[in-house]
Swiss-Prot record:
Annotated gene: maiA
Assigned keywords, A-Z: Isomerase
Active site: C81 (nucleophile), C199 (proton donor)
GO BP terms, alphabetized: protein homotetramerization
Gene3D superfamilies for this protein: 3.40.50.12500
Organism: Geobacillus stearothermophilus
Binding residues annotated for substrate, in chain numbering: N15, C81, L82, V83, Y138, N168, V200, Q201
Name of the protein: Maleate isomerase
Assigned protein family: Belongs to the maleate isomerase family.
Catalytic activity line of the entry: maleate = fumarate
Residues carrying S-(2-succinyl)cysteine: C81
Function of the molecule: Catalyzes cis-trans isomerization of the C2-C3 double bond in maleate to yield fumarate.
Length: 251
């Protein structure tokens, strides 16, 4: 029997990749599992530059977004901005997810809420990885906050690369296939897994499987982790073709 799901996305206003990669993964899945279909519904929070100040101001708009998406009776809500959550201190994703879920319930459209920040932590743990190496587009101080957040979750970051791109639109214009070369400068010798993009706005999907095959290590991203958590929350098989180990259907 056919099943249809509405995916609600809470998106920074300048983010162009969340609404590209997440639908791409689930549409790719639909080709192989046609009886499970998805539509995508977004609400935006204002943000142009990836600074701690703008991110905190943007996060205040997430409540409105959750209520708007619950008006559409979405089956699950995904909060796209990893660094907006992580720059507010360890464990903030749990507070944010609980608050937003409560707002959807108060609005009569109760839905589970996941965040890319929480999803990445869960994705790393699901793979059984204790140590990771990562690539992020952020300026180094923000990358350091991401590393601190991940470390506080009990995961060691053995190496990182910061691309230092402050303009969020420019982050979204990056060629994902460049990551195949960039990752060669990442020390993965002590890592159990590699986070190819610790940012939902930095495109990486076309490179995930290629880099995983190249390194012989599990490779994930903020976006693949978000899709994994979306599928888990809907009690669906966690399978997307050619999207790395996390979405192989094994976990």
């Amino acid at each position: 029997m056919a099943k249809h799901f509405r995916i609600g996305m809470i998106v920074p206003s300048s983010n162009t990749t969340m609404e590209t990669e997440i639908p791409a993964m689930l549409q790719s899945r639909m080709k192989e599992i046609p009886e499970e279909t998805f539509t995508f519904h977004s609400s935006r929070m204002r943000m142009m530059h990836v600074t701690k100040e703008e991110l905190k101001k943007m996060d205040e708009e997430s409540d409105r977004c959750a209520i708007e998406l619950s008006d559409a009776r979405c089956d699950v809500l995904a909060y796209a901005c990893l660094v907006a959550i992580m720059c507010q201190g360890p464990g903030y994703h749990e507070k944010s997810e609980a608050r937003l879920a409560s707002l959807t319930a108060q609005n009569g459209g109760a839905a589970p809420v996941i965040s890319s920040a929480g999803a990445l932590i869960d994705g790393i743990r699901t793979l059984g990885a204790k140590k990771i190496a990562l690539i992020a587009p952020y300026m180094k101080p923000l990358t350091n906050q991401v590393i601190e957040y991940i470390t506080a979750s009990g995961i060691e970051v053995t190496d990182s690369i910061s691309l230092e791109i402050p303009d969020n639109l420019e982050v979204g214009r990056q060629d994902p296939m460049r990551l195949i070369e960039i990752v060669k400068n990442l020390d993965v010798s002590n890592a159990d897994a590699v986070v190819l993009s610790a940012c939902v706005q930095m495109p990486s999907l076309p490179a995930i499987q290629k880099v995983q095959d190249q390194l012989g290590l599990p490779v994930l991203s903020a976006a693949t982790s978000t899709v994994y958590k979306i599928l888990k929350s809907l009690n669906l098989k966690t399978y997307v073709p050619n999207a790395g180990s996390l979405l192989s259907g094994k976990y």
